[in-house]
Regions:
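Alpha-helical structural signal with a strong bias for long, charge-/Ser/Thr/Gly-rich
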Residues: 1-13, 26-31, 37-639
Length: 639
C-alpha cells in the first residue's frame, strides 16, 4: 500500500476481511493500515467495513468512526422479549392414528426412531385399533417382525438403543398374540418365529444367543431392569391387548410434540376409567401426570374438571390449579399425589403428604436437588521406566446422602455407584433414574427418558452428569454422546429451571465436546431472548468451576467470542451480568487465560456504555492490575 498508491483502496478493502477475527491485536493492525492508507471518502471501503461491524471490537469502531455510516443501534434501557409459544398448539398436535392402515404404517417406523414420540404413540394406537384389524392385514406384520428379530439378534442401527430392544421384544409377544388369534392368516409370522428360533439356537453358549424361544417382555429376572418404566408400559399394553374386555386407553400417550399431553385429553381418558370403575395402571398414571402441560389456560378446563369425581377431580384440580392450590383428600393413591406435587412445585413440601412413605427417602432423590461441588485431587500412573507420574485432576461430584435405602458403593473410586430403592411398593417414576448411571451407551435412549418427566427432568440430569460430565477432559464417544443428548434434551424441554439445569448449562460451556458447548450457547441465546434465564447464576457456577480448574477458561472465552457476544443489545447486557458474576467468584491469584475474559468484559462495558461497579470485582481488578500481562486489560476496564 505504501508503494502502490493506485491499489490502496483495494488493499484496505481486502485487509478489512481480517476484522472477522475478534482478536484485539489483529484488529488494531488493520485499523492502523486503514487509517494510514484508506480514504474516508471511499464508498467502496465504507460498504466493505459495514459488513464487519458486528465483529468489530468497540475500540475498533471508535477508531474507524470516520469510515463507518452512522447507524449505531439505539440504546434502550428496556428490551422486548420474544414471545414464548404455548405448549399446546394446533401446529404441534401429534397426528392421530385413525385406521388400522395407519397403525401398521406406524409400526413399520417405530424401530427407526424417526420421532421421539413413536414408541408411546404405537402403544396407544395398538390399544385402540388392534381389535379392528382384518385377517387379510395380518401378513403385513411380517416385515415388521423381521426387523424386530434382526434388531434383537444383530443389534440394529447406530440410532437404536435399549428401548428399541424392549420394543422389539414386545413386538415378538404381540406377534404371538396375532398367531393365536389368526392361526391361518398368521402362519407366515409363525414360520418366521420358528426359523429365527432355530437360527438362535445355533448360537447357544455364545455371546450372540438371545434365547428367542422363551424371550418375552414379561420375563422375570433377578437383575436390575435397565428401563423399568418403559418395560411396565409395554407390559401394561400387552395386558390390555390380551384382555377380553373392551380395552381402556393408555393415559400416558402424548398428544403434542415433543411429548406433552393436553390436560383436556387426560381428563377425557380418566372419565372412561371412571365410567367403568376401572383402576389405572400406576406407572401409566404417573407418566401421564408427568407429561401433562401445566401452562394450559383453557377456559373450558374448570368445566371439564367438574366432569370428574372424587380423587380424580381433586388430583387434577391440584396439579392444574394455581401454585397456592393445596391438595385435598382422599389420598388413596399416594404415588399419584406425590408425583403431582413434584411436577407442580418440586421445592414445596406439602404437609398433606407427611404420612407418605416416600418422605422417608432423602428428598434429593425425588427432586434432583443434590448439593454439588468441584474439587482437585492428585492422580498418578507408572510409565514404561517404572517412574510414577503425578498430575492434578479436577472433578465435578454430587454429595449423595446415605440412608437405609440409599448407599454409595465403592465411594471415591472409579467404579463408584449408588444403590437406591423405594420404600413404597409403588415406586415413583423419578426413583427409577439412579439406575441409569450403571449402564453404558444410553445416549440414544436419553431423549425418551427425559420426556418421561418433562416438567422435572433434574432427577435424570443428575445421573447424566455423574455418568459422563464429571471430568472436563473426557471426550470419548460414550461421554460425548451422553453429553450431547443431555444438553439437547435441555434445549427442547420447557420446564422451570432449578439448580441442576443451570449446572448442566454452565458445565457444558466448558466440556471438551465442541458440539455440546455450541448447544449450551444456543440455549443461553434463546432463553435470554425470552427472558427466562438467570445469567448471573450461570456465571457463579462457572466461577466455582474455575476455582478448581474444571475446564480450560479458553473454551468459554472462545465460545463467547464465536457465538454469545453482539447477538443483540439485550444479550450483551446479560453477558455482562454473567461475566460480572463469574469474576466475583474468582480468586485473587489469576486463573489461566484470565486476560481474554477481562478483554471481553472491557469490550462489553464499552458496548453497553456501563462501568464496573461491583465492589468485589473492583477489589480484584486492583489486585490484578499489578500482574504484567493483565495490566492493559484492567486499565481498559477501569478507564
Amino acid at each position: 500500500a505504501k508503494e502502490r498508491k493506485e491499489h490502496r483502496d483495494t488493499i484496505c478493502c481486502a485487509a478489512a476481511q481480517g476484522l472477522m477475527s475478534r482478536e484485539e491485536s489483529t484488529q488494531s493492525k488493520i485499523v492502523k493500515l486503514i487509517q494510514t492508507y484508506g480514504e474516508t471518502a471511499s464508498t467502496t471501503l465504507k460498504e466493505i467495513l459495514s459488513i464487519y461491524t458486528e465483529t468489530m471490537l468497540a475500540n475498533t469502531k471508535k477508531e474507524l468512526k470516520a469510515y463507518l455510516e452512522n447507524n449505531e443501534p439505539e440504546d434502550s434501557a428496556s428490551f422486548t422479549y420474544e414471545p414464548i409459544l404455548p405448549i399446546i398448539r394446533e401446529d404441534n398436535r401429534i397426528q392421530e392414528i385413525t385406521s388400522t392402515e395407519d397403525l401398521i404404517f406406524l409400526a413399520s417406523q417405530v424401530l427407526d426412531v424417526n420421532e421421539i414420540y413413536h414408541f408411546d404413540l404405537l402403544l396407544g394406537a395398538l390399544v385402540k385399533w388392534d381389535r379392528q384389524q382384518e385377517a387379510k392385514q395380518i401378513s403385513q406384520w411380517t416385515p415388521i417382525l423381521q426387523r424386530a428379530y434382526k434388531l434383537l439378534m444383530s443389534g440394529g442401527s447406530s440410532r437404536n438403543g435399549i428401548l428399541d430392544q424392549l420394543m422389539a421384544t414386545f413386538l415378538l409377544d404381540y406377534a404371538k398374540l396375532l398367531i393365536k388369534r389368526f392361526p391361518e392368516e398368521a402362519q407366515e409370522l409363525n414360520n418366521l418365529h420358528l426359523k429365527m428360533v432355530q437360527k438362535d439356537e445355533l448360537q447357544k453358549g455364545k455371546w450372540g444367543y438371545r434365547n428367542l424361544q422363551k424371550l418375552t417382555i414379561r420375563e422375570k429376572t433377578n437383575k436390575k431392569i435397565k428401563f423399568p418404566v418403559h418395560k411396565q408400559l409395554l407390559c401394561r399394553t400387552l395386558d390390555l391387548l390380551e384382555s377380553k374386555e373392551k380395552p381402556l386407553p393408555l393415559l400416558s400417550t402424548p398428544t403434542h410434540t415433543p411429548m406433552f399431553i393436553a390436560p383436556e385429553t387426560l381428563i377425557e381418558r380418566l372419565k372412561q376409567y371412571q365410567q367403568t370403575n376401572a383402576e389405572p395402571d400406576d406407572m401409566d398414571m404417573q407418566t401421564a401426570l408427568s407429561r401433562v402441560a401445566l401452562e394450559s389456560s383453557s377456559q373450558e378446563l374448570p368445566l371439564l374438571l367438574r366432569s370428574l369425581k372424587g380423587e380424580y377431580r381433586h388430583l387434577l384440580t391440584f396439579l392444574l390449579g394455581e401454585k397456592d392450590v393445596l391438595p385435598q383428600p382422599p389420598f388413596n393413591h399416594p404415588s399419584w399425589w406425590m408425583m403431582a406435587g413434584l411436577m407442580k412445585s418440586p421445592e414445596t413440601i406439602y404437609s398433606e403428604f407427611k404420612d407418605f412413605s416416600y418422605n422417608k427417602s432423602p428428598r434429593e432423590f425425588l427432586t434432583g436437588n443434590f448439593k454439588w461441588r468441584t474439587y482437585q485431587y492428585t492422580d498418578s500412573y507408572t510409565d514404561y521406566n517404572k517412574k510414577t507420574v503425578e498430575w492434578i485432576c479436577s472433578t465435578l461430584t454430587f454429595d449423595i446422602p446415605e440412608s437405609e435405602n440409599s448407599h454409595v458403593i465403592n465411594k471415591d473410586k472409579y467404579n463408584e455407584r449408588v444403590s437406591y430403592y423405594s420404600y413404597d411398593p409403588h415406586p415413583l417414576l423419578v426413583e427409577m433414574y439412579p439406575q441409569i448411571e450403571r449402564f453404558d451407551d444410553i445416549q440414544n435412549d436419553l431423549p425418551r427418558l427425559a420426556w418421561l418427566t418433562p416438567n422435572i427432568p433434574e432427577p435424570l440430569l443428575v445421573w447424566c452428569i455423574r455418568s459422563a460430565i464429571y471430568d472436563p477432559t473426557l471426550n470419548e464417544v460414550r461421554e460425548a454422546g451422553i453429553t450431547q443428548a443431555a444438553i439437547e434434551a435441555l434445549h427442547q424441554l420447557r420446564h422451570t429451571w432449578h439448580e441442576v439445569s443451570y449446572l448442566l448449562e454452565a458445565t457444558c460451556m466448558l466440556v471438551a465436546d465442541k458440539t455440546s458447548r455450541s448447544y449450551a450457547a444456543e440455549i443461553w441465546i434463546e432463553r435470554v431472548g425470552q427472558g427466562c434465564i438467570d445469567s448471573g447464576r450461570i456465571g457463579s457456577i462457572l466461577s466455582s468451576h474455575q476455582h478448581t480448574g474444571w475446564g480450560p477458561l479458553k473454551r468459554l472465552t472462545d465460545l463467547i467470542q464465536q457465538q454469545m457476544i453482539n447477538v443483540s443489545p439485550l444479550h450483551n447486557r446479560e453477558l455482562e451480568k454473567l461475566i460480572v458474576a463469574m469474576l466475583t467468584g474468582l480468586p485473587e491469584k489469576p486463573v489461566k487465560d484470565l486476560k481474554k475474559l477481562l478483554e471481553i468484559y472491557a469490550e462489553l462495558l464499552s458496548i453497553n456504555h456501563s462501568k464496573a461497579e461491583d465492589e468485589h470485582v473492583l477489589h480484584l481488578l486492583d489486585a490484578w492490575k499489578g500482574v504484567a500481562n493483565l495490566k492493559k486489560a484492567v486499565a481498559n476496564i477501569q478507564r
